[in-house]
Amino acid sequence: MTVGRYGLVAGVVRISDKLERIENLLAGSDRQVDDETLLDSIGDMATYCIMMAAECMAIAMNVPDTADTVDNRVLVKLLFDTITNEIDRLCFPVPNAVADAKFLFNRMELSALSQDMTEYARYSGTYQYARMLAAHMLRWFVYGSVG
């Protein structure tokens, strides 16, 4: 999300796009990507909502737009190392090959998402956002839901 450049309207646009995509999937419209699922779109929308909530907190707390400090990098890295270790602890041992493949796929997605998250957290300077998204990611990848 490009909140820094366009303000909170960037989040509203992304959430609106995802909501429209969800409505289309529910209506049975053609998928834009072959393996696109309703659950993927809902997860994406939840992530954008968390990003907006954290951005609102950062605005309320007067967090500077650029807070790329060594301390922030260390905190964000520690957070994602912790969440990755927790996922490892909860998911192993995996009883069969299908579950194993699914777990590895989720870990790859988690890794990509955590890299995006780290970049966003550096830019926005809001560690709170990283904490919120990490909690969301743990629920999503381990328990299969955000609720």
For the regions a language model picked out, list residue spans one by one:
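Intrinsically disordered, low-complexity regulatory regions
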Residues: 1-147
